[in-house]
Amino acid sequence: MTNIHNHKILILDFGSQYTQLIARRVREIGVYCELWAWDVTEEQIREFAPTGIILSGSPESTTEENSPRAPEYVFNAGVPVLGVCYGMQTMAMQLGGLTETSDHREFGYASVSLENSTALFANLNDNLTASEPKLDVWMSHGDKVTRLPQNFQVTGTTPTCPIAAMSDESRRFYGVQFHPEVTHTKKGLELLTNFVVNICGCETKWTAENIIEDAVARIKEQVGDDEVILGLSGGVDSSVVALLLHRAIGKNLHCVFVDNGLLRLHEGDQVMEMFGDKFGLNITRVDAESRFLGELAGVSDPEAKRKIIGKVFVDVFDDESKKLTNVKWLAQGTIYPDVIESAASKTGKAHVIKSHHNVGGLPDYMKLGLVEPLRELFKDEVRKIGLALGLPAEMINRHPFPGPGLGVRVLGEVKKEYCDLLRRADAIFIEELRNSGWYEKTSQAFSVFLPVKSVGVMGDGRKYDWVISLRAVETIDFMTAHWAHLPYDLLGKVSNRIINEVNGISRVVYDISGKPPATIEWE
């Protein structure tokens, strides 16, 4: 079996918003990497045994007295090191160079003139001006290196940053003041490939097929002949976990699908058809609609609704697990960003620390071992693996759906009548987006039920019925988002169909709020 962890890159995180992007780019190249807080110990690095190390950017300033530094062992480990932005600055300072606050901060596009040959820039240039190679890059820095450490040479300059890149070829230490991980740096992926593959010597074995083979082998080794229970929602993460476990242990996997009455139109039937009929999984459907709606009756506060939905799910799931007397393991769809966010750094600078719903959220009364086959994977990697396992692209690329489902898309109190109206309206909206080619152009689109009545005219009569708001956004990272400029004729068609086909809706509006100030979901 291929050892997909044999060659690996260690990324030390100094707090940059782009650090996870570095990891995703390295994985994209085909090499395993892990992202750790900057204040790791020499012992931890030795134990991990990286093939190369990347130092990330940071919002901190190297000129501040207590700003973070790389462990000294990084520069004595005998492996190549790449410093990015702040990472380059701390490398320079720790090896005897100097950094200062710049009079001219650089934020945005810049053109770096390449000087002196370096393995990092081999075969890279975006344009040749008077035979001088240049790279189009993305800068984001207020400090700059003003004196090189011993044995370093300048390999890149800009008019306002004389040392925009540096290298010590003998020790294989490299620094770039720009961000190769962002797409705005045109040759960024090629630069990272030069470092990871050509300089560090990593083999590109991190592929979907190899990851599946490794995951199946590890599941078999972990659980043996034991039985495993999984809460299967039909979302991408739990679906991929289900198929990996099914491949590894077959009927020893027990999938529990909790139908909470807060799902999209026909979603429960689709989950059963897909995983029960098509893939032949051992799956139980629990109709818990009345239990969820009963607990939600009279509750209108969004946070209270979320907590109730979470608690009832755990209770229902636990009731099912008690029926399975031989189960020893609980499978979860925890992915790598969950692990990163929940990792407790000593300083708190490296990551936002928060309790994630998939990490550490288990009730005390479920004393089962944890199986987490996706805990090393980013979301885009989970999708690739899902496709390789045979999940349909339409399902893999479906827009995000909140954990509490329609519980947070019905504003205020949740009632079955409201959910049924919303389901049908939303299905029409999504159907028309797909038919017009706009579903793939938007990052997330959905309908919201507004608990207000509006007057409408149907035939000769007036009626007071409910209002639906349509929401569609375009975003790269879901941290910020723009409302999607859907064509008027498309919006008109959706509105007309909803009002005519969904009895109980008299008005349809379109939400044109960006994030910020508004959030993507209404609740």
From Swiss-Prot:
Pfam families: GATase, GMP_synt_C, NAD_synthase. Residues 8-205 form the Glutamine amidotransferase type-1 domain. Coiled coil: none annotated. Gene3D superfamilies: 3.30.300.10, 3.40.50.880, HUPs. Transmembrane segments: none annotated. ATP binds at residues 233-239. Residues 206-398 form the GMPS ATP-PPase domain. Keywords: ATP-binding, Glutamine amidotransferase, GMP biosynthesis, Ligase, Nucleotide-binding, Purine biosynthesis. PROSITE patterns: GATASE_TYPE_1, GMPS_ATP_PPASE. It catalyses: XMP + L-glutamine + ATP + H2O = GMP + L-glutamate + AMP + diphosphate + 2 H(+). The active site is at 85 (nucleophile), 179, 181. GO terms for molecular function: ATP binding; GMP synthase activity. Homodimer. NCBIfam families: guaA_Cterm, guaA_Nterm, PRK00074.1. This is GMP synthase [glutamine-hydrolyzing]. It comes from Haemophilus influenzae (strain PittEE).
